[in-house]
Amino acid sequence: MSTSNDPVVSSHDPIKQEKEQETDLEAQVEHKKRNERGNAFVGFLILIFVYYLLRGGSNDNDKQEMSHSPGSCMDSESAAVSTSAKCYIPPVLTPAKEPKLGDDVSGIDYIRSPEFFNDSLVRFQELLRIPTVCYDDMGDVGDDDRFDIFAVFQDKVRELYPNIFKKLKVEYVNTYGLLITLEGSNKDLKPLVLMGHQDVVPVNQASLDRWYFPPFSATYHNGHVYSRGAADDKNSVVAILEALEILAISDYKPEQTVIASFGFDEEVSGYRGALPLAHKLYERYGKDGVALILDEGGFTINLFGTLFATVCVAEKGYMDVHLKLKTPGGHASIPPPHTNIGLMSKLVTQIEEPFGGELTFENPFYTTLQCFAENSADMDDNLRQLIKSGDTEKMTDLFSKSRLYRYFFETSIAVDVINGGVKVNALPEETTLAVNHRVDASKGLKQVYDRYGGLLEEFGHEYHVNVTLFNGETVVEYEDAIGHIFASTAKTLEPSPVSPYDESSDAYKKLAGAIRYTFGDGTSVTPALMPANTDTRHYWNLTSNIYRWTPVSTNSTSKNSFNGHTINENMRYDAHMDSIEFFYNFILVSDSGEEA
């Protein structure tokens, strides 16, 4: 694990120069911090969810819902340890060989040097300052000039990492997809693929006055680098580049091929970036032709007195449902019992009825809880007892009382967009509705299709409205109908396969072994479920070993932790250094790891 050494102080020290400029900002920044509530970070980060819920950081409703003791859900005599899900923690793995930069400087020593600490910061900042923003309405590459900024980004990558471009194979896929290959000597070994994405989400212009520093300034302040993209996902992209550059400088010749695959539109589902990259790899290596894929995902956090690294081994499914209701217009002085908007509002209240869910042994979240209970130093005894009992019915009842927990085993419902009406005093003729669902991994998209099929048919009969479902079939049809509702979908994705995380998986052993080597042998590597989706959705045919984990540690009690996708996004710089060290270690361990 990298040391948190302060930057070297010299006449040319960029951090010192920035710190001097920041001194006058200290008071106002701290004032802003005291007057702003930090977000819980990205909703899909399981450990932060767990910490806030069980440590009292969730909202008041959640605290009230969970205030009763978990012990009240069960008799103490019934607490038998479940054998349905084991918390397997692989051994620490160390590299059998390590490259040298010169006669007596190892790669890891160089990464931990003050010189590298300073120089790497400058490179990180330079790439963060390029606003590689991806918007929901992006057109195709070549037709939409908003993609041109990625050429600027890649020119800077070429300038900052010259040895990668001199010694490794670099390819551009669909213009801006970046594929870097460090060829291995043993062609019988399947390659290791490290993923990241170059794009970032837009900055809400109305929020600029709430940023401590301009969102693309990449300002270093109090050990943090503030910038859009610092946490999602340029931290990983830059860390992988740093690791590969060091290996290129050292002329490292691995047995296993190592590939970096960087998309450029992950924030809008990756169809122009990750999908063509995945196709290229499939053409080259074939079905199941890759050993392991690692992309962004869970974090490492100190929870219940233990350091947990939550490696997401699966993702929930995804569906956007679009509904369009058409009715006759007219003068508002003679309205029907329900206007178009009124009818759609009736439907919304029905749509928002929860799906309900059930925590099953097969759900990775069940194993997450088992690992917490088995390895945490100071978890509440009643909660530990409940989890280890394996009583999924009582666990479901308890955890479903909080919105922070329930969506790890239940399909979510978010009515996000509604539009209707054009003028006061004119009856609306059309209302549209968009609903987002993250689909329960145990149910699949069929659950959502079936739910809407029944719900819309019942709605149509109740309000005398014709109904056409997703497949174009009209299931309710009246000659004198007062309207017609149409259902369609835009983006859909079945829940991902579950990647292996037991003793039989060499891939999981290597990943977990490298994590524990980097972050310490006291780290509990824990499988988890990803409620959100990543670019890995396009890579399923390449391997069954797909893992989602971001190699940084975070302190969830800090209001200043990362803030991905929102104001004051930042990365603790020592956490970024840990990322570099991890990717460097992981490449070596995957190639030649041995038990410590």
UniProtKB/Swiss-Prot annotation:
Its cofactor is Zn(2+). It is found in: Vacuole membrane. Glycans are attached at residues 118, 466, 541, 555. The chain crosses the membrane at residues 38-58. Zn(2+) 1 binds at residues 232, 267, 565. Its EC number is 3.4.17.-. One of its GO terms (molecular function) is metallocarboxypeptidase activity. Belongs to the peptidase M20A family. This is Uncharacterized carboxypeptidase C24C9.08.
